[in-house]
């Protein structure tokens, strides 16, 4: 195992990379489609119909490229989450296992965003063009995106984000406190095993609620929706535990206010 002087910078570097990737993901999924950052190619009149698009190489080739990028991300994210790979990584990297997983996921997502090919000439599933929809639909989408991202950040705070990012494992190791998961209750461990993506609904809102749902955006939203759906396995016991934890967090947050009122 590497000394603490190497473990801490490695975990911090992974966290910074993940944070920067998250900021870039907000730009990629929200700011670009909402603020018109997608390059145009002749406007709506130049777009192909659905049947014509199936024979247009200028549409099929970038879609195939985008599909490959998404499959690369999904493959990395799923493969490194398997027990076999996690055991191998824990054996050779120790407490940096989670940080390495987070860093690799961030790099895979960076590849998707950096090399993503828009398809401006492809057909669209829907598009707000005529007034008043051209004004109000983007505004409504913007509001829903802001709410969704605020909820995502709030949920990450309710969950143990330091452990999700791999920081807590290194912190506990340096202080000799053991494995953080070993201190959690069986109900919490059961929840974490079922809920790999605690912000599923909010991410789906960000992916689908856009003024113009073009071909490449449809591919992105559809594939990630399928992936999130397959990875989401909550049951009633998990929901009861989540509700109890949320009430506990709210009670703790309200205690200082109660003290001031007294």
Curated annotation (Swiss-Prot):
GO CC annotations, alphabetized: nuclear envelope; nuclear inner membrane
InterPro entries cross-referenced by the UniProt entry: Nurim-like
Membrane topology type: Multi-pass membrane protein
TM region(s), chain numbering: 5-28, 59-80, 98-114, 134-164, 192-210, 217-234
Keyword Transmembrane attributed: yes
Topology Perinuclear space: residue spans: 29-58, 115-133, 211-216
Subcellular localization: Nucleus inner membrane
Keywords: Membrane, Nucleus, Transmembrane, Transmembrane helix
PANTHER family: NURIM
Recorded family membership: Belongs to the nurim family.
Protein name: Nurim
Organism: Sus scrofa (Pig)
Lineage: Eukaryota, Metazoa, Chordata, Craniata, Vertebrata
Gene name linked to the record: NRM
